Amino acid sequence: MTNMWTLLLLPFFAMLQVHYAWCWSPQDRVLLRDIQTITLYADRYTNARRSAPVPQLKCIGGNAGCHAMVPQVVQCHNRGWDGLDVQWECRVDMDNSYRFGKVEVSCEGFDFPEDPYVLRGSCGLEYTLELTEEGRKRTQDGYRSAGFGSGYFQSNSQSWDSKTDGSSAIVLIFIVILAYGVYKLFLSGPSVQQHPRPDEYGYDHQSQTHSSAPPPGFKSDFTGFSSGYGTGHVNQGPGFWTGLGTGGVLGYLFGNRRAQPYQSPYFNTWTGPSHSESMHQNDRPPQSSGVRTASGFGGTKRR
């Protein structure tokens, strides 16, 4: 009976061996200490045999945040054996605001996790992303100047409100002065100095060039006769010229205000905040000083 089961299972084990040999050749089983360099990419996964594939580059934390900077290509070099495992130096072109924190190369053991042989192409990098001194300064300056959120809009709204209040007061004063000038110029009646009025008989006193006594029974006010009749005229002195000058000045001022482009301080959902460049050039955090090749050092983790 035992021999029968052995005969039945023998083809099955033979098929497993053939499948194993076909899928994983001896070249896929490499000694970890012999690996000198590995190049890892952000958009690729590792090879896997006993476990699931993992990303070749994986951020696991850090005070900069994993989304602050995503390296596209990292190259790790074998820097020697410490008696326990391989030590690595991983290098990447990185903004001066960031640096590697903890780095650890993770490889899949070929037959078991602690196997000194690993599956070729199964190594990936786990790292933390930290802020440099420059990065911390840029972050602090950015929070102070922009507010990052409601503080940003609140501070700009307050400054705009104060500017609006001041300009509204000036405009109101201008409007009052303009209204007064218009009233004096057009609405108030001209002052008449001893202007004669024609009498009820239709007699035109303007044809006379000298004064004479009024007829008996008539008052001198009615007939318009007076000693100063010949010099009577409408007063168009300081009131007229003051109103005219005020209107001209106000027209010039309002014309200049209309000629200046309007710039709203509020957020535009299509283009972002619509402040002018001059309003923000002193509020922006300092720009990065550049990019350099950053290095991180760490050991090996098996899986």
Swiss-Prot record:
Keyword Kinase on entry: no
Topological region Lumenal: 24-168
Residue spans crossing the bilayer: 169-189
Amino acid composition bias (Polar residues), ranges on this chain: 265-276
InterPro entries in the cross-refs: SARAF
Domain of life: Eukaryota
Predominant subcellular localization, coarse grouping: endoplasmic reticulum
One example of a Gene Ontology biological process annotation: regulation of store-operated calcium entry
Keyword tags: Calcium, Calcium transport, Endoplasmic reticulum, Ion transport, Membrane, Signal, Transmembrane, Transmembrane helix, Transport
A single cellular component GO annotation: endoplasmic reticulum-plasma membrane contact site
Compartment list: Endoplasmic reticulum membrane
Region Disordered: start-end pairs: 195-224, 265-303
Cytoplasmic side: 190-303
Family: Belongs to the SARAF family.
Biological role: Negative regulator of store-operated Ca(2+) entry (SOCE) involved in protecting cells from Ca(2+) overfilling. In response to cytosolic Ca(2+) elevation after endoplasmic reticulum Ca(2+) refilling, promotes a slow inactivation of STIM (stim1 or stim2)-dependent SOCE activity.
Protein name stated in the entry: Store-operated calcium entry-associated regulatory factor
Organism: Xenopus laevis
